[in-house]
Amino acid sequence: MMKIGVLGLQGAVQEHVRSIEACGAEAVVVKKIEQLEEIDGLILPGGESTTMRRLMDKYGFIEPLKQFAAAGKPMFGTCAGLILLAKRIVGYDEPHLGLMDITVERNSFGRQRESFEAELSIAGVADDFIGVFIRAPHIVEVGEDVEVLAKYEGRIVAARQGQFLGCSFHPELTDDYRMTQYFLNMVKEAKA
């Protein structure tokens, strides 16, 4: 059985566990570096990206996560997790993990639209996926190897680059598991 980790330092962890299990895989809440060795793919959940970064630094996760990526293992960042994956963040000099060739802007839908739902068409996933956006970032630019999977009002809200998948919204907060299943298929392909 595939083992999918959810970085369990902060954020929407249990909801991801539920969606992984609903797709028939085993979920592992990753709180220690050595747990990275036992999983086939990793979800970086939503939460607060600066808090998550502080905790990643405190527990020494940055380098091991880069090594996990270098080993070819898939990673899926949702909301704050997308910010962690990005090579460039608007208004910041340094990225967090800097793995995915995208530029993201934090809280980019404005305070008035702090949270909202929108129907999205996501390439390879669904034409009618309800995206739950909470203080969401969006992808401002993508590198040439990056495939744009979804846009909302002209803004990129989901993308994939090889083993990396990222989205602005929270797929784990609905009972629609198709985005999680798409990631599990990526993990299956990477293992094959």
UniProtKB/Swiss-Prot annotation:
Swiss-Prot/TrEMBL catalytic activity: aldehydo-D-ribose 5-phosphate + D-glyceraldehyde 3-phosphate + L-glutamine = pyridoxal 5'-phosphate + L-glutamate + phosphate + 3 H2O + H(+); L-glutamine + H2O = L-glutamate + NH4(+)
InterPro entries membership: Class_I_gatase-like, PdxT/SNO, PdxT/SNO_CS
Positions bound to L-glutamine: G47, E48, S49, R106, I134, R135
Record carries keyword Zinc: no
One GO location term (cellular component): cytosol
GO process annotations (BP): glutamine catabolic process; pyridoxal phosphate biosynthetic process; pyridoxine metabolic process
GO molecular function: glutaminase activity; pyridoxal 5'-phosphate synthase (glutamine hydrolysing) activity
Pathway: Cofactor biosynthesis; pyridoxal 5'-phosphate biosynthesis
Active site residues of this protein: C79, H170, E172
Record keywords: Glutamine amidotransferase, Hydrolase, Lyase, Pyridoxal phosphate
CDD domains, A to Z: GATase1_PB (cd01749)
HAMAP family xref list: PdxT
SUBUNIT field: In the presence of PdxS, forms a dodecamer of heterodimers. Only shows activity in the heterodimer.
PANTHER family assigned to the protein according to its UniProt record, in alphabetical order: PYRIDOXAL 5'-PHOSPHATE SYNTHASE SUBUNIT SNO, PYRIDOXAL 5'-PHOSPHATE SYNTHASE SUBUNIT SNO1-RELATED
Similarity remark: Belongs to the glutaminase PdxT/SNO family.
Functional description taken from the UniProt entry: Catalyzes the hydrolysis of glutamine to glutamate and ammonia as part of the biosynthesis of pyridoxal 5'-phosphate. The resulting ammonia molecule is channeled to the active site of PdxS.
Protein's recorded name: Pyridoxal 5'-phosphate synthase subunit PdxT
UniProt organism field: Geobacillus sp. (strain WCH70)
